[in-house]
Amino acid sequence: MRKFLLRLVLAAGVPLMAANPGFGHREYRLTVMGEYSYNNTWGHHGNLDIQALMPFNPYFEMEAKAQLSTASVYNLALQFRPKFTMPVGELFIETDVYVRAIARNQMTDYTASLGLGYRMDYVSVNLGLFTRVMSDWQRSWYTDETFVVEPFNLLYRLEVFCRPQNNPWNLSFLFSNVDDYQMERMWQPLFGIGAYVDVADHWRINLSAQCKPTGMFHLDATFYGATFRAGFTYLF
């Protein structure tokens, strides 16, 4: 009887432990997105996003992103993500570096973050800290002017999926104060919805939308801006 129970446990447990967890990235990916955006500061504008995901091995991946905007705002982002497979899901450490050149205001925004995250088939959560340094292009190195520094801000991200993350199509809902190119103060969350569908062996169509209120956690949830994206991903 004991041998039978042991065989039963092994038969059920080994496939579960060896199964694809359903969310890991195993292919190099190139994503190109067109974007329409409006906010109360920059008005109507369009963006072009180019993103490259590079999973060097099962334990480490890197992502590089660039965005050009008709609002004369230019973004670069790098993400480094060590990953650790757990009995259920995946634990990861994420380091992000963002650079935003705001040509219209002649200033540059540098942001860096460190976060700890966990993801499973239907949910991904990330919590961490980030710091921001802002510099004016007219700043002189020979004066007493200093950078504007925000030393510590809370970073949070919660994304819920309707299907396992390795499914040929999916729909997700996002609550966060960080997206691909910006990190907002903790009281300025972003609400988003995203979808993708695999249309061929190497091709994926992406759609997403985001809305950002103004200072929601200060009880002022008036509309600030919205973004709509559409594009494709090529999986190598």
Regions found by a protein language model. Name each.
Residues W42-L48, S72-L78, Q106-A112, D121, ...:
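Residues that define the transmembrane beta-barrel architecture of outer-membrane proteins
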Residues M1-R29, F236:
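Cleavable N-terminal export/targeting peptides
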Residues A19-A71, T233:
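Short glycine/proline- and aromatic-enriched beta-strand/turn motifs that initiate or cap beta-hairpins
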Residues G34-N40, A66-S72, F84, V97-A103, ...:
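Transmembrane beta-strands of outer-membrane beta-barrel pores
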Residues Y28-L30, F56-A64, M86-E94, Y122-L127, ...:
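Repeated loop/turn-to-beta-strand initiation elements of outer-membrane beta-barrel proteins
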Residues G34-Y36, I50-M54, L78-F84, A112-M120, ...:
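Residues on the lipid-exposed face of transmembrane beta-strands in outer-membrane beta-barrel proteins
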Residues N177, Q182-F236:
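Predominantly the C-terminal beta-signal and adjacent terminal strand-loop region
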Residues A64-L68, V99-M107, D136-V149, Y181-E184, ...:
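Flexible, solvent-exposed loop segments that connect beta-strands
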